[in-house]
Amino acid sequence: MKNIKKGILNCMKRYIFLSSIILIFIIFGIKLGIIISNSSYYEKKLEEKTNIYVSGVSSPRGRILDTNGKVLVDNIGVKTIYYNKIKGIKTIEELEIAWSLEKIIDVKEASIDELKEYYLITNNNGKDLITSDEYRLYEERKIGNETLEKLKLERITDDMINYDTDTKKVAHIYNLMNKGYIYSKKEIVKNVSEEEFAKVIESNIPGVTGEITWERTYLYGDTLKNIFGKVGPITKENKDYYLNEGYELTDTVGLSYLEKEYEEYLKGEKAKYKVESDYKLVKIEDEKKGNDLVLSIDIDLQMKVDEILRDKITLGKKYGNTEYFKDSYAIISNPLSGAILAISGQRLNDDNAFSDISLNTINKSYTMGSSVKGATIAVGYKYNLITPGTYINDACVKLEFIPQKCSFKRLGKVNDLTALANSSNYYQYMIAINLTGNKYKPNMKLNATKEHFKTYRDMLASFGLGVKTEIDLPGEQTGIIGSTVADDLLLNLAIGQYDTYTPVELLQYINSVASGKRMSLNLMKEIKNKDKIILENKINILNDVDLNEESLTRIREGLRLVLSEGTGKFYVPQGLDFAGKTGTSESFLDTNNDGKVDTATISSSFAGFYPSEDPKFSIVVITPNVSHKNGKTDAFYFGASKITKDIVNYLNEKY
């Protein structure tokens, strides 16, 4: 019985052993089959591990176009000379290459440090500069190689490196030839002439190539150039971000504004090279141009608006009290989408030349005055502080210890519509007073609180005032929100004379009045590659205006009366179905740069849209410091009105 059991056990062991062997062969066969069937994949992986690949020096970025397809920003090929190190090349051979290049191309002379390095490589590595005792200390490891090299450099005198001009240039070329990784291309000189470029190529100098790199060119000069933004090398602050995104530190990227905002679409793909064993570069992938950025900007309209601003600033300077008047802004958009058609800022400098300050539209703020009353009157509607259509007598308000506050003139009887049409401050004051729970009486105290200010600011923000517009330009700032709580400042806030707003905030506000919705402003219309649309802008609604449609309709009607019979009667051609609001405000300047405001000025503004129903255009115009506080002149009145009228005339003529 024992023998039988033992035999059975031995058979089982043999069976398990044979089964294991068979299973191992099956697994091996499956693995071998997988490897054979995927041989190209593994060959590629092996190649990636055993070969070195490098990118080309640059690739063309995508163009920037206007809404009609006109090219605004393009790329220009720059003829550039490069050196690719040859495996096993000797120093004397590289110096010969440098001398050959120096005879063809013009480069700057070497720096002192470069000249000292040149001296060492051409003088037995400076061995004569080190004493025998110092060499002994080095051999005894009492001083290191770093100390030895430092001593050599310190002992090279000015006379030793007093080379002629040609030699100094050769020293600089040699230094450029030996920068960076051994297998990477070294830029020797860029923007060479056609003749120099041809000579370098014809000379067939070992390791030297002539290639085209790409730089931005602006087809309309400085127009919108600061809005486009800059491109350049990766900055130290952004190094980690770009490296994580797969960039190389030598890459050119968008550094600001539109170039930065749409970097991921505008960037091109550089050519790819395989590094052969002799360091020769073999191209395996061609470069690819980036996608084109199409803007909502109409460049013809943009240039016309720029021209109008320059003309009207120049004209205004002929009037009195305009010492501080030098800037003007105008923005035009589609109020139902937020698409910007023109965005302009012009400044007259002391040398009577103009500069483009269009970026101030997103990062510089002003008190806008009565032009924001379309939003402040909304507080009265929402909280039932006014009765639509009911008339009151326009008058002045006198609070305790505060000088009386009035409209710019006595307006007689006004209701909500005519108060907007004729810019009654008194009507707005009554809304603010009613908000505090008081009934007006002379020399009263309102006891205004933070909550009263918040009520106004929440409503203003609902229209886009005091908050970012979310325009697709990095660096947008909001205006200044006053921190002091006081009775008179609540009244000031109600007439747009306390907080400050940027020009784009004013634009978003008037668009919100027109549509009933606060939409982000945008410059990007679409991004495309040839005829294929990669990304298309979509209307981005940030919030609905915090007001019912009946009240919004009432506000629009009041703004229509502004242009037909009120303070804006001469801002646009008569008979045009236009809605808008004029504004004047008190501003303060620091004229002697001592950090303290010392001069009171008057600024004017306008915000409007037309037609008043289903509008096609919205316009804001701002003319800061157009006059002195102590003397309103014709220049004050002409500021925003003349600019607005000229822009509207052009729009009617062309569109």
Regions inferred by a protein language model and the residue ranges of each:
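Beta-lactam-recognizing serine transpeptidase/beta-lactamase-like catalytic domain environment
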Residues: 71-74, 272-286, 297, 301, ...
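A short acidic/glycine-rich loop-to-helix N-cap element
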Residues: 625-640
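Short, gly/Ser/Thr-rich active-site loops of penicillin-recognizing serine hydrolases
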Residues: 534-536, 638-655
